């Protein structure tokens, strides 16, 4: 069965992608999920400088679910390029940053 898709001119092996923010760059989940089965990894947002995000509390339970406001916490582009890009490259999958 053909599972490849063309998404805005980018060929993906299949249409399954991670959700931005919840999956980091995937390294944290690699022992639980075969990341090479994904069509693409959508990374957490990254800024030009490290960003601490919002102060705690960041999560609140509400009737029917929860709310979160992490505040785009990230290590900055230098750390992302040094640590995450090599990891993403070895997956042989498309990455959306």
Regions found by a protein language model. Name each.
Residues 96-97:
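Conserved small/polar residues in nucleotide/adenosyl-binding loops
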Residues 2-6, 26-93:
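Glycine-rich, positively charged N-terminal anion/phosphate-binding segment
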